[in-house]
Design a protein with these regions (language model features):
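Compositionally biased regions
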Residues: 5, 30-33
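Charged interaction patches that mediate protein-protein contacts
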Residues: 1, 21, 452-453
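Intrinsic structural disorder/low-complexity segments
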Residues: 9-10, 16, 32
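Carbohydrate-active catalytic/glycan-binding domains of CAZyme proteins
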Residues: 33-547
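Bacterial N-terminal signal peptides
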Residues: 15-29
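N-terminal secretory signal peptides that target proteins for export/translocation
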Residues: 1-12
Length: 547
């Protein structure tokens, strides 16, 4: 009887996937006794929030992700329905080492874990060069306590805490081959009761070399007497999600692939988190690597069969789930939410919007929102001791790409101190393209510049320059399908003229490409110059179509 029910559910799940519009009602009625008539489409967040971890506290869901060397670090997102999210804060405002006062691509905060324990929110994260850190807070929006170094180590990554029923605390983590010399191992340690110290040398609870190479990002849970570890394997681009279970926390652990790409277009469904709603439904949020767009987030239904999770839909009957493109929304008390990810900024507040991050630990003297009402003033500073190209600047203010296709418009007024000062709009990954306002004698000019392989210290190339009659200009970047970008400018905000050529945005080190604004000068120079930005407006294709 149970098998028959499961077969019927899967049958209607398949029908649901064929046409998420026409057959929605049929599928929903078959899949759930709840009167929900809403669906969602993946990705739920088309933005670079890699290595997500998610928890539920009451009716609220909270999500965190990797942030590497950007600051503030460890973004904290909030949702009431697992589909609509907004940023509410950051768990690590400044990274706790001076090396992060300058950009350190690919280093910093890797794969943090979020848990709620004893009335507090706990975040553990690994820095592959420094060790395992912990921060905690009473409120997920902050303030968060300063990072505590739990274990100084090299190559320890992706930590996740777990408190067992008897109160004993544990920490599981993976290994970075680039630092430790090996990977594909999951190691479990006992933790002190305050969560601040590792108490033993650790036990290898799973070796994935033969069956699940590059296993990493473990997340620890307990259900129905089993200890579960959810962990991706096989690599970011083409891997799969592995499920491990054991009746003993130290193992041995059985293993099973619980989510794979299969016949879908969702490559390498990677690291994520299992969540259970108040109604007892199980869901899984994971990332998909999408090149220049970074690691975008998907939401999958979870079905438990014989105490194994089946994530997504088993379309081919091989017992392994495949990602869904669309599905009915989770059965929660707030199926419809006004939450949306922050993007545009009119700079009318006394603080920057939470969507902004700097490329390194930031200094208050880099900017102000109070010098001119309704404007963000970026000062022409350059904290980098050496600056081969704009990629060396820590003081570029950036956002993640918010959608597959979007337009960014900003207006700046440039007030240089010397010919060395510059300000503008940039799209940056391992390569960058920028529109830069500069000053030469009595003339202002706007240039289009590109630079490739910025980490190798290459110089940028200026391919086109136009004169400006005044130091005020509107700048625009259009990002199209496939992250192909074009730039344009306007002197009146109405008529835009193209400048430069088509630019193919590319990913950075472990991150997607980003859009940003900047003001800078040459290294070591003291400048009193600045640029005032009136607004930063983003329009996605969905928003444009609604007009």
């Amino acid at each position: 009887m149970i098998n028959s029910i499961h077969q019927r559910i899967r049958f209607y799940q398949k029908i649901f996937l064929i046409d998420c519009g026409f057959l929605t009602i049929l599928a929903i009625n078959s899949l759930s006794a709840q009167p929900a008539d809403l669906t969602y489409s993946n990705p739920i967040i088309h933005t670079d929030y890699s290595d997500p971890d998610v928890i539920r506290v009451g009716d609220d869901f909270y999500l965190i992700s990797s942030s590497f060397s950007q600051a503030p670090g460890v973004p904290v997102l909030h949702s009431r329905n697992l589909v609509n999210w907004q940023i509410i804060g950051y768990a690590v405002p400044h990274l706790p080492d001076s090396i992060y006062d300058l950009p350190q691509p690919g280093r910093g905060i890797w794969a943090p874990a979020l848990r709620y324990h004893n009335g507090e929110y706990w975040v553990y994260y690994g820095d592959p060069d420094l060790g395992i850190f912990m921060v905690k807070a009473q409120n997920p929006a902050g303030p968060w306590e300063p990072p505590v170094l739990v274990k100084q180590a090299c190559g320890w990554i992706d930590p996740c805490p777990f408190w067992d029923d008897d109160g004993q605390a544990y920490l599981i983590h993976a290994w970075a081959k680039s630092r430790a010399g090996f990977n594909s191992i999951l190691t479990l340690h006992k933790l002190s009761s305050d969560g601040r110290q590792i108490l033993d040398e650790g036990v290898t609870v799973f070796d994935g070399h033969s069956t699940h190479p590059t296993i990493e990002g473990p997340k620890f849970y307990k259900r129905n007497g089993y200890y579960y570890i959810f962990a991706p394997a096989g690599g970011v681009t083409n891997g799969w999600q592995t499920g491990l279970r054991s009746k003993n926390i130290l193992g041995p652990y059985e293993d099973k692939i619980v989510l794979e790409q299969g016949t879908t277009a969702i490559n390498g469904p990677h690291q994520g988190a299992w969540i259970e709603t108040n109604q007892g439904e199980s869901w899984f949020i994971h990332f998909q690597d999408k090149g220049a767009y970074g690691r975008i987030l998907h939401l999958q239904p979870v079905e438990w069969l014989n105490d194994w999770p089946l994530i997504g839909i088993d379309l081919d009957g091989n017992g392994i789930g495949e990602p869904v493109q669309c599905f009915r929304r989770p059965d929660v008390d707030n199926p419809i939410s006004a939450f949306q990810m922050q993007t545009s900024d009119e700079f009318e507040s006394n603080s920057l919007g939470l969507q902004w991050q700097w490329r390194a630990n930031f200094k208050p003297e880099w900017f102000t929102l109070s010098a001119r009402s309704g404007y963000l003033r970026l000062f022409t500073v350059n904290p980098a001791p050496v600056c081969y190209n704009l990629g060396d600047l820590p003081n570029i203010l950036t956002q993640k790409f918010p959608a597959e296709a979007f337009t960014v418009t900003t207006k700046l007024s440039f007030h240089p101190d010397s010919n060395d000062d510059q300000a503008g709009l940039i799209i940056i990954g391992n390569d960058y393209a920028a529109l830069k306002v500069t000053h030469r004698g009595a003339r202002y000019q706007l240039t289009y510049a590109e630079c490739t392989e910025i980490e190798k210290g290459k110089s940028e190339i200026i391919s086109e320059t136009v004169g400006l009659n005044k130091p005020e200009v509107f700048l625009k970047a259009n990002v199209g399908e496939g992250a192909v970008c074009t730039f344009s400018y306007s002197t009146d905000g109405e008529k835009y003229l193209p400048l430069g050529r088509k630019f193919q945005a590319v990913k950075g080190k472990w991150v997607g490409s980003q859009i940003g604004i900047f003001a800078a000068t040459t290294p070591g120079k003291i400048s009193s110059g600045y640029a005032d930005f009136d607004f930063f407006r983003i329009s996605t294709m969905d928003k444009i179509e609604l007009k």
